[in-house]
Amino acid sequence: VEDGQVQARLVVAPGGEAAARAAVAAAGGRVTGALGDALQVWLPPAALTAVATAAGVAALGAPDYVQLAEVTSEGVARADADAWHAAGLRGQGVRVAIIDAGFQGYNAKLGTELPAGVVVKNFVDGQPDAEVDATTAHGTACAEIVHDMAPAAELYLLKIATDIDLDQAVTYAIGQGVDVISTSLTFLNVTPGDGTGKFAAMAARARNAGVLWATAAGNYREQHWSGQWADA
């Protein structure tokens, strides 16, 4: 709850976006983002039922929030990155956007574990850029690994909380001319898992703009099961 309102994900019925947006406004809420047929909205709790049943609204529920994986680094030597560094290849002229749920403590590491200067941007609703340094140190750890591997690269620390925030961050990164997007994030059970869906579309959009997207994989390999669906 923030300022008496809760964040929600509104799925728009076909052809109903104008009506859905009007319902949100009439309830005293606001729309802060959009992705496909979904709107990211803030609403008074008392208005949730009315908006959920309004014209133009197919569904209303909790946002698709990001989940964080563990961060483990075996260091530069294990990757033989030090050999590249010795050859003068240290990431000069490369811009890397690290998209994460928070970069707590990053300020204290500037000039040591991180470059002396970084670009920060916060895409979480209602949060200023200063609150990039909050919530979790997961993104800070990821940025440190990137800096270890490419110490001369320029880093962009972009904070998100939802799938729609992520889409906005990707758009920003492309507009800033970044060369690499790095994510170590998970969204559980919100895409088909077959290389299609909203996240695949984001990655394709970045790739078409000449951006390499590097992402963590396999963190949940022993924590899930899949099989053919059967009606019990």
Please provide the spans of the model-predicted regions:
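Autoinhibitory N-terminal propeptides
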Residues: 1-136, 145-148, 154
